[in-house]
Amino acid sequence: MEQGICGSHVFFIEDGKSKNYIIGKYKIGYLSGDNLILDPYECLYLYFKGRISFQNSDSFRDLFDTVTFDRYVAYEILKNKGYRVKEDSGLIYFRKGTEKPLSLRVMREYDRIQFSDLVENPVDYYFTVDEEGDPTVYSSQEIFPAGRNLVSPVSAPVVRMGGRSFGAGDLEWWIGTAFHGFRLLTENEANYISGNHSASQVDMVYSDLVGRGCIVKTGFKYGANFRVYLGRDSQHAEYLVSVMPEEERWYSISRGVRVASSVRKTMIYASIYKNEVRYVALKRVKDII
C-alpha cells in the first residue's frame, strides 16, 4: 500500500491505487521522493472519498481543525466541479486550465466585514455555510452607477409643515411626491435642494447618485436607504442601495442581498471611502460558474 504525507500526518492510498493515479485523476498533490505530498484540504477531500486512510486515528480531527468546516465545504464543492483549488492567506483560489484564478472568501454568518475590504481587497465570490450546513454564494463587483436622467442644478426653498418637509416653487419631476398641491420631500431630497449635500454620509451618497443621472427614491420598504432608477423609462428600480457603516455583520449584508434578489433588483452597498463615494454590488448566485 503506497503512502503519503500531509504535514506531520501519514496516510495510505486505498484500493491499490498509485500516487500518480491520485495526482492525475484529482489534480492534487505532488511527489517528493517516494511520498505523495498533500495539503490539508486535499487530504480531507481524498479521505471523504475513501481514497486514503490515516496511520493515526487522530489525524482526521487535527486536519479538520486546521481548515475549518466552512472552508472545507467550499473547497469540496469547487473540486467536485472540476476546478483546481488552492487556499492562500485565508482566500480560496480556483480555476480550470490556465485561465486567471477566481477568488473566494468564506464568511460566517456573524463575521464582521469592513467596507474597505470590499473595495481594497475585492474577491469574485463570498461563500457562507449556515448553521445547518447549507451553502450560499454571492458574487461581488465594484460598480459605477450611470443613469440616463439629465440633471440640472436644483435649488428651492424648503418648508416644514406637520413635521415633514415640502418643496416650494417649481421642482424637477423626479424630486418629491405630489400631495394635495404640495411636493412632499424626503429628508435627503430636502437637504439636496437646500444645498446641504454633505449633511450625512447618506446625503452624500444621495447627491452622488443624482449627479450620476439616477432617479433616487426611498428604499425603506425594502430595508435599504434608496431604490434607484436608471432612467425615467425604467418600469422598476434597478438597484437597492444601502449606505454601509465602516463595519457591518455579514448577516446584515446577506439579508439585504436576499431581499434585493427576491424583488429582482441588484443590491449595492455604498460608503465614503478616501473622500469618494464607492459602490459594491453583491448578488446571490445559484451556482459558481
Swiss-Prot record:
GO biological process: one example: tRNA splicing, via endonucleolytic cleavage and ligation
Keyword Lyase (UniProt): yes
CDD domains (UniProt xref): tRNA-intron_lyase_C (cd22363)
SUPFAM superfamilies referenced in this protein's UniProt entry, alphabetically: tRNA-intron endonuclease catalytic domain-like, tRNA-intron endonuclease N-terminal domain-like
Xref: InterPro entries: tRNA_endonuc-like_dom_sf, tRNA_intron_Endo_cat-like_sf, tRNA_intron_Endonuc_cat-like, tRNA_intron_Endonuc_N_sf, tRNA_splic, tRNA_splic_arch_long
Catalytic activity, EC: 4.6.1.16
Active-site residues annotated for this sequence: 229, 236, 265
Chemical reaction(s) catalysed: pretRNA = a 3'-half-tRNA molecule with a 5'-OH end + a 5'-half-tRNA molecule with a 2',3'-cyclic phosphate end + an intron with a 2',3'-cyclic phosphate and a 5'-hydroxyl terminus
Functional summary from the UniProt entry: Endonuclease that removes tRNA introns. Cleaves pre-tRNA at the 5'- and 3'-splice sites to release the intron. The products are an intron and two tRNA half-molecules bearing 2',3' cyclic phosphate and 5'-OH termini. Recognizes a pseudosymmetric substrate in which 2 bulged loops of 3 bases are separated by a stem of 4 bp.
Protein name (record): tRNA-splicing endonuclease
Organism name: Thermoplasma acidophilum (strain ATCC 25905 / DSM 1728 / JCM 9062 / NBRC 15155 / AMRC-C165)
Organism phylogeny: Archaea, Methanobacteriati, Thermoplasmatota, Thermoplasmata, Thermoplasmatales
